[in-house]
Amino acid sequence: PPRQFIEIYGLQDELTPDVPIDEITILQQGEISFVPSAEGEDAPKVMKWNDDVIIKQLISYAVGCMMGRYRLDKPGLHIAHPEPTAEEIAPYSYHGRKYEIDDDGILPLMNSDCGFSDNAPLRMADFVRIVFGEETQVENLNYMEQCLGKTLEQYFVKDFWKDHKKMYQN
């Protein structure tokens, strides 16, 4: 923990392990909120995870993986330029399962009856299967939909693009 590092390096006069939440640079996009404690108004507020925000971030990351921007098996950006090579967009293995980057860079955000095999809701279900396993796929998809308050299909068709753009605007 931070306190131990401060002591090991003799930085007690320079640093404190106590950091106000508003100075933490992660978790600043609505992932958490502070709510009154059950102990009353005078008690310290309790940190609450906003699962809907976290699920929306997971979906945006998953779409990034589908498009090749990120890879499941490597940290950082993968394809960050307009002309990827065949090697960069080649399928790869993750947890022993084959993962494919979208071949044309277009993910339809449409209802399931649209006829496109790379439709975003279908790709999302496959992403969940590959990342978290087939055994828990239905449970995980149900949880995601519960957090969103709608089906993945409804989310992709109606809200994904708006939420995704908002996430990356400064």
Model-based region annotation:
Residues R3-I6, E14-N170:
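Terminal accessory regions of large proteins
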